[in-house]
Amino acid sequence: MSEQKLALNEYLKTDSDYLRGTIKEGLDSSVTGSFSDGDQQLIKFHGFYQQDDRDLRNERKEQKLEPLYSFMLRARVPGGVCTPKQWLGVDEIASTLTSSNSIRLTTRQTFQYHGIPKRNLKTIIQGLDREALDSIAACGDVNRNVMCNPNPVESKLHAQAYEVAKKLSDHLLPHTRAYAEIWLDEEKLLTTEDETVEPVYGKTYLPRKFKMAVAVPPDNDVDVYTNDLGFIAVAENGELVGFNLTAGGGMGSTHGEVETFPRLADDFGFIKTEDVMKFAEAVMTVQRDWGNRTNRKRSRLKYTIVDHGYEKFKAEVEARAGVKFEPKRDVVIGDRGDRYGWVEGVDGKWHLTLFIESGRIKDVPGKSLQTGMREIAKIHKGDFRMTSNQNMIIAGVAPEDKATIEGLARKHGLLGQVLTQTRGHSIACVALPTCPLAMAEAERYFPEFIDHIDALQAKNGISDQAIVVRMTGCPNGCARPFAAEIGLVGKAPGRYNLYLGANFEGTRLNKMYRENIQEAEILAELDALFARYAVERNAGETFGNFTVRTGVVKAVIDAAKDFHG
């Protein structure tokens, strides 16, 4: 049998001189606001994507103008923690160098800028560098931003888990100096040993993106089972002793292609804290060597485990780590939401969690969110923690400073909004007009959609029940819709696939209930189901579990076999 041809991206990576390509030349060109096709793939490793305003695409085409190109830049902020000083720098960049004039908190605990003209990219990256921030490996076929539960109650355990997340992020960064040379004007160093440039990744990096999270039970706001690699903290007497390791999660799929599917990670066993780096590197290098490099739609770790088998994969990871898994420890995985309002930590400091709808921090009529965050940053003595639910925690507030912080938050609309249980558990991706993959609206439409859900819950007397609702403009799954009790995935403008049946804790996927339907049909279906749920539910039964128990949808047990079936 002839050898299969590699995916185009593999050749691009091989020939890129460790992610340099012709990015520098493209950056210097004023002929177009775009990069070349090849460099558009390489710039992802540097932390940004090329986009254009799709609302204006046809108009500009009629005017014989190229699309209004801009860039989305995503920062690397392991664990989502930054200082007030850093935030002021982040805010200044958003206000002066982007057309969106906003900061977008992401579902992976970092922030994005939208609407960056090519000419401003270098200035922005240098501005982030001055604040000890960067965007390297925030995108691309590498380990992405490492998530970690903010967990403001168990501060000591959070601090230990956060240190692990930071070490994972730093240890698994690409070693190439391309980022420093192109964006920070550092000199290129001569090298003769190809593979020593990237001791973990090698010349072709990973077959596909790689996502990692550290969870601190009982919280699961990081949706640990949706990640390629997860570490679930195990504590004894309040001290971190190790982790249950999970591997093989991932949300992305392609409409109509049954060989692609979302998947939740498998449990592999317990590892000691001192062995975390060994196992992380072992899992990544197995994926590097075994992952599919011919078909990018089947290149994630989840498919590697499915194709090679759990036991074979586990044995290879143990062999490379030089350590065997112990039986997994018992831990309780619970709520995926954030604790809104004030929460006192074990150290006597207070933490204020702010609900940021769809993560968009921007001044709009009636809500000066960006100004409010800026004013808080000017006086705050603790830190800021971005959550994977697109929210913000003002962390480490002394008791005597609470009133001032709360006053600013209320003045600028960061506090005081009516927040239902379901809205507090809802997230959406950006989608239109900037995301090139979006087939339907998400962020711009989602607040209105949640208004409808809230009204239906109130009508049926179930407003006290939190339901995890998520919406994306395409099946790539950035807002993790396939792990939502109600998931909406864009199929075409104004049309979505409706998924039901994931559980509240995030340990079971949902399943398609209705395909390619519009708002009126979606709401009619949910109204009928809410009416049944109100009278037929068992005590304490969540909506997702109800839809499975009553046969509305079948439980997804093995995604490779039954997600589409």
Swiss-Prot record:
Claim: Iron is one of the keywords in the record: yes
GO biological process: cysteine biosynthetic process; hydrogen sulfide biosynthetic process; sulfate assimilation
EC number: 1.8.1.2
Keywords linked to the UniProt accession: 4Fe-4S, Amino-acid biosynthesis, Cysteine biosynthesis, Heme, Iron, Iron-sulfur, Metal-binding, NADP, Oxidoreductase
SUPFAM superfamilies assigned: Nitrite and sulphite reductase 4Fe-4S domain-like, Nitrite/Sulfite reductase N-terminal domain-like
Catalytic activity: hydrogen sulfide + 3 NADP(+) + 3 H2O = sulfite + 3 NADPH + 4 H(+)
InterPro entries (UniProt xref): CysI, NiRdtase/SiRdtase_haem-b_fer, Nit/Sulf_reduc_fer-like_dom_sf, NO2/SO3_Rdtase_4Fe4S_dom, NO2/SO3_Rdtase_4Fe4S_prot, NO2/SO3_Rdtase_4Fe4S_sf, NO2/SO3_Rdtase_FeS/sirohaem_BS
Job of this protein: Component of the sulfite reductase complex that catalyzes the 6-electron reduction of sulfite to sulfide. This is one of several activities required for the biosynthesis of L-cysteine from sulfate.
Name of the protein: Sulfite reductase [NADPH] hemoprotein beta-component
Lineage: Bacteria, Pseudomonadati, Pseudomonadota, Gammaproteobacteria, Alteromonadales
